[in-house]
């Protein structure tokens, strides 16, 4: 694989790279480094800890259908030369659909990496040229058949910032009307509404094991539910 110079890459570029399966240049993710120095140097440490590593080279070592794996050679703000490996991903939209009666719509599907069926919120990768809202609308329609009159982004987070570039956008979907689902050929999805108390109980007893779903539901119940 060819050596590359430091460059910046957009999330849409990542999607193109995944589609083409080509090696591309990229920049390493920001890194912060702790410094156990004396209290007198706290101010200088605060400034240094927010500096980004210098990227010496970047290689795509794997290009699959869903994500890329990059290996970057970097110099940390401390001067340490090291290797950083990360998964490049264009981001995902996660939908929390609330029916007119207040129930929350969850889906169940088989997640191959876990070797089990999981209950979770509607979610999917943001395709090239899509906004998080457009991706949310598409995923909701495909996986459940429901259409929503209103979407509102209420939370953004990185699920695994240690090595995964993916950013998740959680959107509240309201004003739902039913329709015909349009799942992918390899998807077998069951959609089912639950009351707020039922969803809370599913979290309490461990029936909900999907992190994005737990985060989204708890945030909604704590700050948004009326």
Feature map (PLM): residue ranges:
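Short, low-complexity, intrinsically disordered N-terminal modules
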Residues: 1-3, 17-19, 27-30, 46-47
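Intrinsic, low-complexity polybasic segments
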Residues: 7, 16, 28-40
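Conserved Nudix-box catalytic region and its N-terminal flanking loop in Nudix hydrolases
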Residues: 45-52, 84, 94-138, 155, ...
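Acidic, metal-coordinating catalytic segment for phosphate/diphosphate chemistry
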Residues: 53, 57-94, 100
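Short beta-strand micro-motifs in enzyme catalytic cores
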Residues: 68-72, 117, 167-169
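Unchanged
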Residues: 82, 91-94, 125-211
